[in-house]
Swiss-Prot record:
Superkingdom in the source lineage: Bacteria
Localization terms from the record: Cytoplasm
GO BP, sorted A to Z: regulation of DNA-templated transcription
Record protein name field: Probable transcriptional regulatory protein BCG9842_B4761
SUPFAM superfamilies, per the entry: YebC-like
Principal localisation: cytoplasm
Family: Belongs to the TACO1 family. YeeN subfamily.
Organism: Bacillus cereus (strain G9842)
Matching Gene3D superfamilies: 1.10.10.200, 3.30.70.980
Gene Ontology annotations for the cellular component aspect, listed alphabetically: cytosol
Keywords tagged on the record: Cytoplasm, DNA-binding, Transcription, Transcription regulation
GO MF annotation terms: DNA binding
Keyword rRNA-binding: no
Length: 239
């Protein structure tokens, strides 16, 4: 699982060099979370998760404040949260999460990104059963044993705790996201390298080189769509 997260992290770091794109996606996600509940992260857990994620991407405060103020101002702009599932080359499994104000446009765009890159959209539930919703928290400056002790003392459960290069990665149930962070903050951890609610594949597949090239093009095409927030898959992209 650890190598899987590094796989995702490295890919995201490459793609998210386009800061304007990632900031725009966060702005939309923050607005939706703030609009659906209270615009206060203390009472709105969904908003708190998004803001914690935004910190790890260095999203500017101005973008965060603008999105929250837009929600406070009673903007009539509404977005639907939709999930698409599909297959890439060689049957690779893909989940695409979107926020859209035009369902027909988004469905057509996602379908085209699949079909133009040797993939195809599946029906609801066709691949999601092979993924687990997971909270992933990363930090530096502690060992895995130290993190385990901190979580045990706070009576917080984790699925797994792994050391990866200079970081420790904690994998937990989604509803433990805030509990894990709170326990670590209480032990002096001030910054997190990773703070995600993600879908992790239960097992990875390795593609032949030509299929992997095509698959990466498909993922890039999906991630470049304005309405797409997250793309999850079960392909080991290698180092």
């Amino acid at each position: 699982m650890g190598r899987k997260w590094n796989n995702i992290k490295d890919k995201k770091a490459s793609k998210d060099a386009n800061t304007s794109r990632i900031y725009a996606k966060f702005g939309r996600e923050i607005y939706v979370a703030a609009k659906q509940g209270e615009p206060d992260p203390e009472s709105n857990q969904a908003l708190r998760v998004v803001l914690e994620r935004a910190k790890t991407y260095n999203v500017p405060r101005t973008i965060i404040d603008r999105a929250v103020e837009k929600a406070k101002g009673g903007s009539e702009e509404n977005y639907d949260e939709l999930r698409y599932e599909g297959f890439g080359p060689n049957g690779a499994m893909v989940i695409v999460d979107t926020l859209t104000n035009n369902v027909n446009r988004t469905a057509a765009d996602v379908r085209a990104a699949f079909s133009k890159n040797s993939g195809n959209m599946g029906v609801n539930g066709s691949v999601a059963y092979m993924f687990d919703a997971t909270a992933v928290i990363g930090l530096e400056g502690k060992t895995s044993d130290e993190v385990l002790e901190i979580l045990m003392e706070a009576d917080v459960d984790a699925r797994d705790i792994l050391e990866e290069e200079d970081s420790v990665i904690v994998y937990a149930e989604p509803d433990q996201f805030h509990s894990v962070q709170s326990a670590l903050k209480g032990a002096g951890v001030e910054e997190f390298t990773v703070a995600e609610l993600t879908m992790l594949a239960q097992s990875d597949v390795t593609l032949p080189e030509d299929a992997q090239v095509q698959f990466e093009k498909m993922v890039d095409a999906l991630e470049d769509l304005e309405d797409v927030q997250q793309v999850y898959h079960n392909v080991d992209l290698g180092e």
